[in-house]
Design a protein with these regions (language model features):
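SAM-dependent transferase fold signal centered on methyltransferase-like domains
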Residues: 1-372
Length: 372
């Protein structure tokens, strides 16, 4: 079937498509992801004018890579599925775009050639491709992870195997996935003396997406590793505590309630997950013509204002724990501000927020309003 995206026309797998194997994948629900990719590339081009080449490492029908090519990037698309390669070539010709489409496994292609920007968008975990990407990506590494159950701790053993970390399925499980992924990528980069700086990261609709600026220097890799640490989480009162460093120092009892049902997670990325100035630059490069323009701008505005502290709270989950009705989020955050704490909405859902207050301090600051 034919679809239009970003002003281009593509043939993609569908019931009405003839001659296209079912193994070639196209997900219309990922249009926000692709729109943000284009806007991010536009912002990054301004940040680093020397970046020119872009690898779409798992191209499938070619939509993401061809949209980058339409913006002037020197694009290589590769896929190990021959039917996908054929379809990507047809779509390039259909849109009169000069793109190098190669029939190759992503790891093989990355070991063969270096690129300024590398985009990993696999089905499932990106970690089997991370080492090759860090070895051959010069500037910007774009990564999608769709295996959110392992990342967030719902499929614990799979998460440990894939990411070399202990994930926990908490009430802030989307952010757990974000920070487990960033930790694994930072550790992978460090093996190549590459440091990572997350410019934009979000958890949306059952996937995590991050854009990492790379610096090839041992001291940069060391600095990234210093952003790693562990987390202690109390299952009884939802208190959590973050500890920097690769050697965990777990709590024996909860400082807030005295409980002993504590979960430990890590290593996690405890540093910032976004650069607010870059996020604003991406937002400014979303045109009205994008189908997801309003949704994308709303997401980016929330990310720009989101506090850089780990980890978020869910207001409704806290109120349920306390046996109190939830009030308007703006009023809730205002109470925290009046009590002297920093607080912001978080992008994970409409009821999530971030603050530098502990769970006990949150309750003390908001209890009067919640009880009215």
């Amino acid at each position: 079937m034919r679809v239009t995206e970003g002003g281009l026309e593509f043939e993609v797998p569908g019931e009405s498509t003839r001659g296209v194997e079912a193994s070639v994948f196209y997900n219309p629900r990922q249009e926000l992801n692709r729109d943000l990719t284009v806007a991010t590339l536009r912002a990054y081009e301004r940040r680093n004018p020397h970046a020119e080449s872009y690898l779409d490492a798992m191209t499938a029908s070619g939509v993401r890579g061809l949209r980058a090519a339409a913006d002037g990037w020197a694009v290589t698309c590769c896929d190990r599925d021959e039917a996908a390669v054929d379809l990507a070539r047809e779509n390039a010709a259909r849109n009169d775009l000069e793109v190098d489409v190669r029939h190759a496994d992503a790891n093989v292609e990355l070991h063969r050639s270096a690129y300024d920007v590398v985009d990993l968008d696999p089905f499932g975990t990106p970690m089997p491709f991370a080492d090759a990407a860090f070895a051959r990506c010069r500037n910007l590494l774009c990564v999608t992870a769709t295996d959110t159950a392992p990342l967030c701790g719902a499929h614990f053993n799979s998460g440990v195997r894939s990411y070399g970390a202990v994930p926990r399925n908490t009430d802030y499980h989307p952010e757990m996935g974000v920070r487990i992924l960033l930790s694994a990528l930072a550790r992978s980069g460090a093996r190549f003396d590459v440091g990572v700086q997350p410019l934009l990261t979000h958890a949306s609709s059952h996937y995590v997406r991050t854009y990492l600026e790379l610096e090839r220097k041992p001291t940069a890799a060391d600095a990234a590793l210093e952003e790693l640490g562990s987390l202690s989480h109390c299952e009884d009162c939802l208190y959590r505590e973050h500890h920097r460093g690769l050697i965990a120092d777990p709590l024996e009892t909860c400082p807030n309630c005295g409980g002993e049902r504590l979960l430990e997670a890590g290593p996690l990325w405890l540093g910032p997950t976004c650069d607010p100035a870059f996020v604003a630059a991406v937002r400014d490069r979303i045109p009205d013509e994008f189908a997801t323009a309003n949704k994308g701008r709303e997401l980016l505005e929330t990310l720009e204002a989101e506090l850089a502290v780990p980890t978020h709270y869910d207001q409704h989950r806290l109120c349920k724990e306390w046996g109190l009705p939830a009030n308007a989020m703006d009023d809730f955050l205002a109470d925290l501000g009046e009590a002297g704490y920093d607080a912001s909405r978080a992008h994970y859902s409409g009821t999530t927020f971030k603050t530098d207050a502990t769970v006990g301090e949150i309750r003390a600051a908001t209890a009067e309003s919640l009880s009215d």
